[in-house]
Amino acid sequence: MSSTVSTLWRDCLLQLQDQVSSNDFTTWLRPLQDDVSESNMILYAPNCFIKGWVENHYLTQITKLAQQLLNNDQFMVKIQDGIKPTEKTTTNVEQKTQNENCHNEITSQQNYRSYLNKNHVFDNFVEGKSNQLARAVAQKVAKNPGEQSANPLFLYGGTGLGKTHLLHAVGNGILANNPHAQVVYMHAERFMQSYVKALKSDRMDSFKRFYRTVDALLIDDIQFFAGKDGTQEEFFHIFNSLFERGRQIILTSDRYPKEIEKIEDRLKSRFGWGISVAIEPPELETRVAILLKKAEEKNMVLPEEVAMFIGGKLRTNVRELEGALNRVHAHAEFTGKAITIDFVRETLKDMLALQDKLVTIENIQKIVADYYRIKISDLKSKRRSRNITRPRQLAMALAKELTNRSLPEIGRNFGDRDHTTVLHACKAIAKLREEDNGIQEDWSNLIRTLSV
């Protein structure tokens, strides 16, 4: 296929439509305008963000395609932001000034408005089974923001599990790929305050224009919108505007979207349009890895057996682990003592005592019995029907995961069962969690309930 100067961009688009996803084509390529001469083609992007993205991801592909269509290896393709001029009166100096102004405006707005924590990146996010999927999806979004399959991205889980870290990591990842992008991180409470302030100062037009034109909007703790009708109404329209334009939306909450009370159904429905991913409390291996990673960042000597001890005792969330580590570090520096298990046991005695009270076997039995609508006595009975056996195995596995009780102690609390029965239950549940999505979902729900 060959082209003429007058049909070049149209012919390029026809081929590009088959080479890129429909979402990418609509978002990045269709908005471009062309100005073609015998020696080059200038593409005009409606804003700096699209210009930067096309320049980084498609310009080489477009240039090669244009050269092939014209059979001219010297043909050049350039891109700049702005509207295609009706007459070519803009000088090079004027165009350079326009580009610099646009870049400076976006950079200034980004530095002032993004609120991203540059220290929260993917490289220092400790991965484990509890957050593996969430991290993978977040990285995909950072590389390809706006892809419909993950828009919005909804991360949910208990306090201190790393949702906010991942949120910032995605934002920083988007900016790393495209420094011109307008990425805004906002806690839900701050968003509400911004909305009320705009309302009172009669600046709603400015408020709407800003939030509806960003390239990625990251809202933390969306459950804070509960019962705030005005905020929900405005966010509904912001969501629609961004989604229709293929802009990325990322939200976090302490619970699954449909479980958030006093949030309008139309918003809950939209929260589920993309992908919702749970972040669970970290398992022992991840807890230990987090402690060792944080200790390394502090240049702190933390023996692995001590990390195992702390990780085995404190199971609720990452924030709790960091708090414990900070206390141990401070006490060690103040006293000059070596960090041993005995030293940690003494330093964290109040935290460890509280943790023992937080999750008990009795509490686990009650939560599991309520969840499956059976009696606690069923969990302790000799009954072997499937509707009793599976909850019993789950309860025993949870007791091993969330308490400091030994296998024999757990067995005694479940109708004087042998420790080998408890071990078998733990192995069976671990296997089922990998093979059966229903069991994994039950496990996640129970863990979240017990971690509150």
Curated annotation (Swiss-Prot):
Stretch list, region Domain IV, binds dsDNA: 333-452
Top-rank taxon: Bacteria
Xref: Pfam families: Bac_DnaA, Bac_DnaA_C, DnaA_N
Main localization of the protein described in the UniProt heading: cytoplasm
Keyword Nucleotide-binding: yes
Protein name: Chromosomal replication initiator protein DnaA
Originating organism: Histophilus somni (strain 129Pt) (Haemophilus somnus)
Region feature (Domain I, interacts with DnaA modulators): 1-80
Binding site for ATP: G160, G162, K163, T164
Function: Plays an essential role in the initiation and regulation of chromosomal replication. ATP-DnaA binds to the origin of replication (oriC) to initiate formation of the DNA replication initiation complex once per cell cycle. Binds the DnaA box (a 9 base pair repeat at the origin) and separates the double-stranded (ds)DNA. Forms a right-handed helical filament on oriC DNA; dsDNA binds to the exterior of the filament while single-stranded (ss)DNA is stabiized in the filament's interior.
GO cellular component, one term: plasma membrane
Region annotated Domain III, AAA+ region, chain positions: 115-332
Phylogenetic classification of the source organism: Bacteria, Pseudomonadati, Pseudomonadota, Gammaproteobacteria, Pasteurellales
Keyword Transmembrane helix found: no
GO BP of this protein: DNA replication initiation; regulation of DNA replication
Region Domain II, residue ranges: 80-114
Record's subcellular location: Cytoplasm
Self-association and partners: Oligomerizes as a right-handed, spiral filament on DNA at oriC.
Keywords annotated in UniProt: ATP-binding, Cytoplasm, DNA replication, DNA-binding, Lipid-binding, Nucleotide-binding
GO molecular function: ATP binding; ATP hydrolysis activity; DNA replication origin binding; lipid binding
Gene3D superfamilies in the cross-refs: 1.10.1750.10, 1.10.8.60, 3.30.300.180, P-loop containing nucleotide triphosphate hydrolases
NCBIfam families in alphabetical order: DnaA
